């Protein structure tokens, strides 16, 4: 494989670092470690990819980004669900609460910083939240109607003013 991108950018010298797997059963310790590592990567201006099992890993990733930057950032959330619950199954750091925790961050100015794509289901708590807050969303049905090109243009237009954007994909966006 040649060391270039499809835009003929030279990748020679590009380094990939695997920070390892996280196995700690203590969610608090796990979150602190992920947050610290992400913050360090962002401070070093490194591009990173986080691959995790449970979507709750988004919470410490966003906290790490937030602690490392000094400007507002956007979030593109591609998922079958909003993940906007204040609490789910007794936990505020559940996979269903990731974006609710995001809007509590210093550099996320409420739900308007988030663009939800592919949503096909919502919890009652999320519907109540949406009644009182502006939420950018293209549902799965609307995506089908608009088509990929129009969705991409809509999202680009809405998110263009952000210097930094975090993209998160939950596996159920594929079905």
Segments predicted by a language model, with ranges:
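Conserved alpha-helical scaffold segments that buttress catalytic/binding sites
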Residues: 1-175
